[in-house]
Swiss-Prot record:
Enzyme class: transferase
Organism: Pyrobaculum calidifontis (strain DSM 21063 / JCM 11548 / VA1)
Name of the gene this protein is made from: lipA
EC number: 2.8.1.8
Cofactor: [4Fe-4S] cluster
HAMAP family xrefs: Lipoyl_synth (MF_00206)
Residues binding [4Fe-4S] cluster 1, per UniProt: C33, C38, C44, S274
Protein name as catalogued: Lipoyl synthase
Length: 291
Protein backbone atom coordinates (compact mmCIF):
# COMPACT_ATOMS: atom_id res chain seq x y z
CA UNK A 1 0.00 0.00 0.00
CA UNK A 2 1.21 3.48 -0.85
CA UNK A 3 2.12 5.65 2.12
CA UNK A 4 -0.44 8.41 2.74
CA UNK A 5 0.58 12.04 3.01
CA UNK A 6 0.34 12.08 6.81
CA UNK A 7 3.01 9.39 7.27
CA UNK A 8 6.04 11.63 7.28
CA UNK A 9 9.07 11.27 9.56
CA UNK A 10 10.64 14.45 10.92
CA UNK A 11 14.41 14.76 11.01
CA UNK A 12 16.07 15.50 14.33
CA UNK A 13 19.13 17.44 15.44
CA UNK A 14 22.05 15.86 13.60
CA UNK A 15 24.56 16.57 16.35
CA UNK A 16 22.43 14.87 18.98
CA UNK A 17 21.81 11.91 16.67
CA UNK A 18 25.56 11.40 16.28
CA UNK A 19 26.08 11.75 20.05
CA UNK A 20 23.49 9.09 20.86
CA UNK A 21 24.84 6.69 18.23
CA UNK A 22 28.40 7.13 19.48
CA UNK A 23 27.43 6.61 23.13
CA UNK A 24 25.40 3.52 22.29
CA UNK A 25 28.24 2.07 20.21
CA UNK A 26 30.87 2.86 22.85
CA UNK A 27 28.81 1.16 25.57
CA UNK A 28 28.19 -1.89 23.40
CA UNK A 29 24.44 -1.80 24.00
CA UNK A 30 21.45 -2.20 21.70
CA UNK A 31 18.53 0.15 21.13
CA UNK A 32 15.05 -0.91 20.08
CA UNK A 33 15.10 2.24 17.95
CA UNK A 34 17.52 0.52 15.57
CA UNK A 35 16.58 -3.14 16.03
CA UNK A 36 12.86 -2.55 15.37
CA UNK A 37 13.43 0.03 12.60
CA UNK A 38 11.39 2.63 14.50
CA UNK A 39 10.22 5.50 12.26
CA UNK A 40 10.86 8.02 15.05
CA UNK A 41 14.52 7.16 15.56
CA UNK A 42 15.91 10.43 14.19
CA UNK A 43 13.31 12.56 15.96
CA UNK A 44 13.89 10.90 19.35
CA UNK A 45 17.67 10.68 19.02
CA UNK A 46 17.69 14.29 17.91
CA UNK A 47 16.06 15.15 21.23
CA UNK A 48 18.65 13.08 23.09
CA UNK A 49 16.34 10.23 24.07
CA UNK A 50 16.61 6.53 23.35
CA UNK A 51 15.04 3.20 24.28
CA UNK A 52 17.63 0.63 25.32
CA UNK A 53 17.17 -3.02 24.37
CA UNK A 54 18.54 -5.39 27.01
CA UNK A 55 19.01 -9.15 27.16
CA UNK A 56 20.52 -9.26 23.70
CA UNK A 57 19.03 -8.70 20.27
CA UNK A 58 17.61 -12.19 19.61
CA UNK A 59 13.99 -12.82 20.63
CA UNK A 60 12.56 -16.24 21.43
CA UNK A 61 9.21 -15.21 19.95
CA UNK A 62 8.20 -14.34 16.39
CA UNK A 63 5.39 -11.80 16.46
CA UNK A 64 4.18 -10.87 12.98
CA UNK A 65 4.63 -7.13 13.44
CA UNK A 66 8.14 -6.95 14.88
CA UNK A 67 11.47 -6.60 13.05
CA UNK A 68 13.65 -7.85 15.93
CA UNK A 69 15.60 -11.02 15.12
CA UNK A 70 14.21 -14.33 16.37
CA UNK A 71 16.06 -17.44 17.48
CA UNK A 72 17.52 -19.18 20.51
CA UNK A 73 19.74 -17.02 22.78
CA UNK A 74 20.74 -20.24 24.60
CA UNK A 75 20.27 -18.82 28.07
CA UNK A 76 23.01 -16.21 27.79
CA UNK A 77 22.73 -13.11 29.99
CA UNK A 78 25.54 -10.54 29.99
CA UNK A 79 26.40 -9.60 33.60
CA UNK A 80 28.11 -6.40 32.43
CA UNK A 81 25.01 -5.09 30.64
CA UNK A 82 23.46 -3.15 33.56
CA UNK A 83 26.63 -1.12 34.11
CA UNK A 84 27.07 -0.47 30.39
CA UNK A 85 23.50 0.77 29.94
CA UNK A 86 23.84 2.97 33.02
CA UNK A 87 27.08 4.43 31.69
CA UNK A 88 25.45 5.27 28.34
CA UNK A 89 22.56 6.99 30.13
CA UNK A 90 24.95 9.01 32.28
CA UNK A 91 27.20 9.96 29.36
CA UNK A 92 24.22 11.25 27.39
CA UNK A 93 22.69 12.97 30.41
CA UNK A 94 19.28 11.50 29.61
CA UNK A 95 16.45 12.73 31.81
CA UNK A 96 14.06 9.96 30.80
CA UNK A 97 15.12 6.43 29.90
CA UNK A 98 13.10 3.54 28.48
CA UNK A 99 14.41 0.02 29.06
CA UNK A 100 12.88 -2.79 27.01
CA UNK A 101 13.92 -6.28 25.99
CA UNK A 102 13.43 -9.15 23.65
CA UNK A 103 11.32 -12.04 24.96
CA UNK A 104 13.52 -14.54 26.78
CA UNK A 105 11.44 -17.68 27.24
CA UNK A 106 14.75 -19.56 27.57
CA UNK A 107 15.33 -18.02 31.02
CA UNK A 108 13.55 -19.25 34.18
CA UNK A 109 12.43 -15.73 35.11
CA UNK A 110 12.02 -14.47 31.53
CA UNK A 111 14.78 -11.94 32.14
CA UNK A 112 13.08 -10.15 35.04
CA UNK A 113 16.18 -10.15 37.23
CA UNK A 114 18.17 -8.44 34.47
CA UNK A 115 15.49 -5.75 34.19
CA UNK A 116 15.76 -5.19 37.94
CA UNK A 117 19.56 -4.99 37.75
CA UNK A 118 19.48 -2.48 34.89
CA UNK A 119 16.93 -0.25 36.66
CA UNK A 120 19.02 -0.23 39.84
CA UNK A 121 22.23 0.46 37.92
CA UNK A 122 20.71 3.39 36.02
CA UNK A 123 19.20 4.86 39.19
CA UNK A 124 22.58 4.61 40.93
CA UNK A 125 24.67 6.02 38.06
CA UNK A 126 22.17 8.63 36.84
CA UNK A 127 19.91 9.44 39.82
CA UNK A 128 18.32 12.36 37.97
CA UNK A 129 16.88 10.08 35.28
CA UNK A 130 13.33 8.78 35.31
CA UNK A 131 13.19 5.14 34.20
CA UNK A 132 10.40 3.43 32.28
CA UNK A 133 10.49 -0.32 31.72
CA UNK A 134 8.68 -1.91 28.79
CA UNK A 135 8.64 -5.60 29.66
CA UNK A 136 7.57 -8.83 27.99
CA UNK A 137 4.84 -10.84 29.71
CA UNK A 138 7.25 -13.10 31.65
CA UNK A 139 4.78 -15.91 31.00
CA UNK A 140 2.40 -14.22 33.43
CA UNK A 141 4.73 -14.81 36.40
CA UNK A 142 3.71 -12.74 39.42
CA UNK A 143 7.16 -13.22 40.95
CA UNK A 144 8.87 -11.87 37.83
CA UNK A 145 6.62 -8.81 37.64
CA UNK A 146 7.14 -8.13 41.35
CA UNK A 147 10.92 -8.28 41.05
CA UNK A 148 10.88 -5.60 38.35
CA UNK A 149 8.43 -3.34 40.19
CA UNK A 150 10.46 -3.64 43.39
CA UNK A 151 13.54 -2.32 41.55
CA UNK A 152 11.80 1.06 41.44
CA UNK A 153 11.01 2.02 37.82
CA UNK A 154 8.97 5.19 37.48
CA UNK A 155 6.68 3.58 34.87
CA UNK A 156 5.90 -0.08 34.23
CA UNK A 157 4.81 -0.63 30.61
CA UNK A 158 3.64 -3.76 28.84
CA UNK A 159 1.96 -3.59 25.46
CA UNK A 160 -1.38 -5.20 24.69
CA UNK A 161 -0.42 -4.57 21.03
CA UNK A 162 -3.77 -5.28 19.36
CA UNK A 163 -7.43 -6.08 19.93
CA UNK A 164 -8.55 -9.40 21.37
CA UNK A 165 -9.77 -10.89 18.06
CA UNK A 166 -6.50 -10.24 16.25
CA UNK A 167 -4.12 -11.31 19.04
CA UNK A 168 -3.63 -14.89 17.71
CA UNK A 169 -2.86 -13.50 14.24
CA UNK A 170 -0.61 -10.61 15.26
CA UNK A 171 1.33 -11.90 18.27
CA UNK A 172 3.38 -15.04 18.86
CA UNK A 173 1.33 -18.10 19.83
CA UNK A 174 2.77 -17.93 23.37
CA UNK A 175 1.34 -14.46 23.89
CA UNK A 176 -2.12 -13.96 25.38
CA UNK A 177 -4.45 -10.97 25.53
CA UNK A 178 -5.59 -11.93 29.01
CA UNK A 179 -2.08 -12.67 30.30
CA UNK A 180 -1.02 -9.19 29.16
CA UNK A 181 -3.92 -7.65 31.05
CA UNK A 182 -2.98 -9.72 34.09
CA UNK A 183 0.63 -8.50 33.97
CA UNK A 184 -0.57 -4.89 33.95
CA UNK A 185 -3.00 -5.60 36.78
CA UNK A 186 -0.27 -7.18 38.91
CA UNK A 187 2.07 -4.24 38.36
CA UNK A 188 -0.67 -1.77 39.30
CA UNK A 189 -1.57 -3.71 42.45
CA UNK A 190 2.09 -3.44 43.49
CA UNK A 191 1.87 0.33 43.22
CA UNK A 192 3.40 0.98 39.80
CA UNK A 193 2.38 3.64 37.32
CA UNK A 194 1.30 1.49 34.37
CA UNK A 195 1.28 2.00 30.62
CA UNK A 196 0.30 0.04 27.52
CA UNK A 197 0.23 0.44 23.76
CA UNK A 198 -1.95 -0.52 20.81
CA UNK A 199 -1.34 -0.67 17.05
CA UNK A 200 -4.12 0.03 14.57
CA UNK A 201 -4.42 -0.61 10.85
CA UNK A 202 -4.28 -4.40 11.18
CA UNK A 203 -7.94 -5.05 10.41
CA UNK A 204 -9.53 -4.11 13.72
CA UNK A 205 -12.74 -2.12 13.96
CA UNK A 206 -13.20 1.19 15.78
CA UNK A 207 -15.38 -0.50 18.40
CA UNK A 208 -12.78 -3.22 18.97
CA UNK A 209 -10.19 -0.57 19.77
CA UNK A 210 -12.60 1.03 22.23
CA UNK A 211 -13.12 -2.39 23.81
CA UNK A 212 -9.36 -2.87 24.18
CA UNK A 213 -9.05 0.58 25.75
CA UNK A 214 -11.87 -0.31 28.13
CA UNK A 215 -10.10 -3.54 29.07
CA UNK A 216 -6.94 -1.57 29.86
CA UNK A 217 -8.87 0.85 32.03
CA UNK A 218 -10.45 -2.05 33.89
CA UNK A 219 -6.98 -2.97 35.14
CA UNK A 220 -6.32 0.70 35.95
CA UNK A 221 -3.68 1.45 33.31
CA UNK A 222 -2.56 5.10 33.58
CA UNK A 223 -0.98 5.84 30.19
CA UNK A 224 -1.86 4.52 26.74
CA UNK A 225 -0.33 4.94 23.29
CA UNK A 226 -2.07 4.28 19.97
CA UNK A 227 -0.20 4.24 16.66
CA UNK A 228 -0.36 3.09 13.06
CA UNK A 229 1.07 -0.35 12.28
CA UNK A 230 3.88 -0.12 9.73
CA UNK A 231 5.09 -3.31 8.09
CA UNK A 232 8.80 -3.93 8.71
CA UNK A 233 11.01 -4.65 5.75
CA UNK A 234 12.55 -7.95 4.83
CA UNK A 235 10.58 -10.97 6.05
CA UNK A 236 7.52 -12.76 4.70
CA UNK A 237 6.11 -13.36 8.20
CA UNK A 238 5.28 -9.69 8.63
CA UNK A 239 1.63 -8.74 8.25
CA UNK A 240 0.46 -6.35 5.57
CA UNK A 241 -1.05 -3.01 6.52
CA UNK A 242 -4.81 -3.39 6.15
CA UNK A 243 -5.68 0.29 6.43
CA UNK A 244 -4.04 3.66 6.87
CA UNK A 245 -5.81 5.21 9.83
CA UNK A 246 -6.29 8.97 9.25
CA UNK A 247 -5.21 11.55 11.86
CA UNK A 248 -8.80 12.49 12.66
CA UNK A 249 -9.53 8.91 13.73
CA UNK A 250 -6.56 8.97 16.09
CA UNK A 251 -8.04 12.13 17.56
CA UNK A 252 -11.29 10.24 18.21
CA UNK A 253 -9.35 7.48 19.94
CA UNK A 254 -7.56 10.07 22.05
CA UNK A 255 -10.82 11.71 23.08
CA UNK A 256 -12.41 8.35 23.90
CA UNK A 257 -9.40 7.24 25.96
CA UNK A 258 -9.33 10.47 27.92
CA UNK A 259 -13.06 10.15 28.60
CA UNK A 260 -12.43 6.65 29.97
CA UNK A 261 -10.03 8.08 32.54
CA UNK A 262 -6.52 7.48 31.18
CA UNK A 263 -4.20 10.06 32.73
CA UNK A 264 -2.14 10.46 29.55
CA UNK A 265 -2.90 9.49 25.95
CA UNK A 266 -0.49 9.65 23.02
CA UNK A 267 -2.23 8.86 19.73
CA UNK A 268 -1.16 9.47 16.15
CA UNK A 269 0.04 7.82 12.93
CA UNK A 270 3.72 7.58 13.94
CA UNK A 271 3.22 6.98 17.65
CA UNK A 272 5.10 4.05 19.18
CA UNK A 273 4.96 2.92 22.80
CA UNK A 274 8.07 4.89 23.77
CA UNK A 275 7.33 7.96 21.65
CA UNK A 276 6.89 11.13 23.73
CA UNK A 277 7.31 8.92 26.80
CA UNK A 278 8.65 11.72 28.98
CA UNK A 279 5.85 14.09 28.00
CA UNK A 280 3.25 11.40 28.74
CA UNK A 281 4.83 10.77 32.15
CA UNK A 282 4.72 14.48 33.01
CA UNK A 283 1.09 14.72 31.86
CA UNK A 284 0.24 11.75 34.08
CA UNK A 285 1.91 13.50 37.04
CA UNK A 286 -0.01 16.71 36.42
CA UNK A 287 -3.32 14.88 36.42
CA UNK A 288 -2.40 12.71 39.41
CA UNK A 289 -0.82 15.16 41.84
CA UNK A 290 -1.22 18.52 40.16
CA UNK A 291 2.47 19.07 39.37
Amino acid sequence: MELPSWIRVKAGDYGRIVAVREAVFAAGVHTICEEAHCPNIFSCWGEGTATFLILGDVCTRACKFCAVKTGDPRGFVDPTEPARVAEAVAKLGLRYVVITSVDRDDLPDGGASQFASVVKAVKARAPWAKVEVLTPDFGGSAEAVASVVEAGPDVYAHNLETVRRLTPLVRDRRASYDVSLRVLKMAKELGAVTKSGLMVGLGETFDEVLEALSDLRRVDVDIVTIGQYLKPRGHKRFLEVQRWVPPEEFEKYREAAEAMGFKAVVAGPLVRSSYKAHEAYLEMLRKTIGR
